[in-house]
Structures are given as C-alpha cells and as structure tokens.
Amino acid sequence: MHYCVLSAFLLLHLVTAALSLSTCSTLDMDQFMRKRIEAIRGQILSKLKLTSPPEDYPEPEEVPPEVISIYNSTRDLLQEKASRRAAACERERSDEEYYAKEVYKIDMPPFFPSENAIPPTFYRPYFRIVRFDVSAMEKNASNLVKAEFRVFRLQNPKARVPEQRIELYQILKSKDLTSPTQRYIDSKVVKTRAEGEWLSFDVTDAVHEWLHHKDRNLGFKISLHCPCCTFVPSNNYIIPNKSEELEARFAGIDGTSTYTSGDQKTIKSTRKKNSGKTPHLLLMLLPSYRLESQQSNRRKKRALDAAYCFRNVQDNCCLRPLYIDFKRDLGWKWIHEPKGYNANFCAGACPYLWSSDTQHSRVLSLYNTINPEASASPCCVSQDLEPLTILYYIGKTPKIEQLSNMIVKSCKCS
C-alpha cells in the first residue's frame, strides 16, 4: 500500500517537473517577425564587419557591366547549387565561415580577340585546354575560401552522339616520363544537342596550388570519360587510338562554325549572343581583417538531426515565410542588389513526451534546478540555411559579397 502511494507521489512529482521544464518562450507571429528583421539587420552588419550602415551616397546612374557580371554569375551559381541539393535531398553545410566573402571573377583570355578573327589552324577533337591568369590574386592566396570554374555548354545540333560524359582535369607539370600529366577533378554527363547550360566545377584545390606556386598553373583540360588517347602537355599533342571525339561545344572556346550552320550573318548573330558567356573563375576570399576574427572565434559544427516537413498552417514547429525588403524593413538604400530576399524564420511548438519510467526526466529535473534560466525542452530552430549574394557601395566603390547562412530553408526541434 505504501509502495503504491509512494509511486503515485513520485509520478505526480515527475510530471509536474517535466511541465515546468518547457522554458522556450512563445511569441506571436508579429513579434517573431520583428525580432527576425532586427536579427537580420545585425547579422548583415556583423558579417561585413560594419558597426553601422555605410553613409548614404547618390546611387550610380549605371553599374559597371563587369560588376553586374560578377554579381549575376555568383547569384546564378548559388541558385544552381541549391537546385541540385534539393533534387538530391542534400543539405547546405551550416559550418561555413561566418563573415562575408569577397567575390572576384577572372575571365579566360579570349581565343578569338575580334569578330573577324580566324580560328586557330589546329583543331583538338578530343579535348579542350582552358587557362587563367590568377597572378593578381597571389597576395591573397591564404584568404581563398572557394574557387569555381564555370563554362557554358552550347547546343550542338551537329553532334553525332546525344550524350557524353565530360571530365575536368588539372594539367600537371611533369617531372619525368613516368610522372602523371593530369589530375582528375570532376565529371558531368551532358546532352550535346540540348539547350545550352552553365557547368560548374569546384577547383579550390587547383587554384590554391596556383596561387602558391605560379609555375604549376598550366590550366585545365576538358575531355571525355575515356578518350583512350595519350595526352602530352609539353606540346599539346595527343596519340589517338580511335578515340570518341568531344561533341560538346563551349562558349568562348570553340569557334562558332564548329556548332552553327548558316551564313556569315547567322554566325555573327550567334557569336554576339554568346559573347557574355566566357569561361571564368569565381574566387571567394575572406578579407584579412575578417580572417583574423574567424580564426579566433571559430564556430563549432552543429549536428544535423532528422528533418521533418511541416506545413505553415500548423501551430507546431515549421518554416514561416518572411520577405525582407532592405529599403522598407531596414531603411537601407546602400544595398544595390538584390532589393530584398526571402529570409524566412522558424516558429512553433515542439511537443515533447517525457518518459516517467526512465531516469531521463529525473536528470532533466535536476538540470532545470541547476540551470533555471536554460531551456531543457526542445525549441524550434533553423536547420538548413543558404547563402545570399549582395552588391553594395562603400562611397563610390562597388563591392560584391557572399553572406553565409542568410536564407532559412527548413526547421527542426532541438
């Protein structure tokens, strides 16, 4: 009898303690939004290492085309990556560097310097060579965070095969006849006759090596998965063994006549259409003054729990839409592009069932006693986040930065 009374008393005590442990504050949606907007204001300034917004200057009548080109390339690259992750059910890394990264674009030197230029007399049917001059960035070698090689695949109606697997290699400086002449980077399957598309490759390691060792910058090689031929980089010579030719065509690399049929007017029009699609590198660097702060305040990786999809109509934890208009919501005119973005936020209850027949609730009760201000119950927090690219002005100087973890894509109870 005494045992039953004691058990009932203990159970009542544990339930009461468990209820008292839910210390996550509950706010109405308007208050959530206001707090989220203010958090974004501080987040952007913090990532840019600014204590206050830049002084307002008259907006330029026209942004230089090369600046717009870098911004568009960076924005498109992030959108492509997000689409690929969504298709593959992958998540954005949440342990990226906190501070904003400066973005630089390095175009490949043109093969055809003028409209009337004659293509090279030699034709490489099995591969393409692409080179970049990164010497201007050597002083910032240690600040490199990411490097992407982007090349635009053109539609080739003349292609004899509809699909090919192309591979990207870093050309190596061979020390002797037995040493390797190339290093594999990545591969992609492309449809040669389909509409054109941008192809992106992560070349961080290769560019990092070039920045530290200028003599090793011999460029990239684009070839087929199994060309079955020997490549000699010293004289750009190959020994073919009935190799399959590379049917994919690339803007800025292949002459217009190799993939376009028609008169000179058609060829000229096609060349003009593809003039802004030159192969290029996108380098993302952390400025020195931010690099020092990053190294001294390195954030720890967060464990990613299982993701669950919630509808916004629910009261439980889920992703809530929130569009931030920089001018309207923050009173800022200094960010030129974009005008705003979908920041989103996480809100809602996180139901948690305590088990009275285990020691878990007792431990949590003790934890709450020792840490009365802490939350022992799960709270609704962001899980997957994506970066944001902005174009802004400091005085009359345009700057392009990539801000990590700015767009909330999913939530979790943690």
Curated annotation (Swiss-Prot):
Q: What domain of life does the native source organism fall in?
A: Eukaryota
Keyword terms of this UniProt record: Cleavage on pair of basic residues, Disulfide bond, Extracellular matrix, Glycoprotein, Growth factor, Mitogen, Secreted, Signal
- The record lists the organism as Mustela putorius furo
GO MF terms held by the record? amyloid-beta binding; cytokine activity; growth factor activity; protein homodimerization activity; signaling receptor binding; transforming growth factor beta receptor binding; type II transforming growth factor beta receptor binding; type III transforming growth factor beta receptor binding
Q: Which SMART domains match?
A: TGFB
Name this polypeptide is given:
Transforming growth factor beta-2 proprotein
Q: Name one GO cellular component term.
A: extracellular matrix
Cleavable signal peptide:
1-20
Residue positions with a glycan: N72, N140, N241
One of the protein's GO biological processes: collagen fibril organization
- Does the entry feature the keyword Signal, yes or no? yes
Query: InterPro entries, from UniProt?
Result: Cystine-knot_cytokine (IPR029034), TGF-b_C (IPR001839), TGF-b_propeptide (IPR001111), TGF-beta (IPR016319), TGF-beta-rel (IPR015615), TGFb2 (IPR003940), TGFb_CS (IPR017948)
Q: List the disulfide bonds.
A: C309-C318, C317-C380, C346-C411, C350-C413
Assembly mode:
Interacts with the serine proteases, HTRA1 and HTRA3. Interacts with ASPN. Interacts with MFAP5.
Return the similarity comment.
Answer: Belongs to the TGF-beta family.
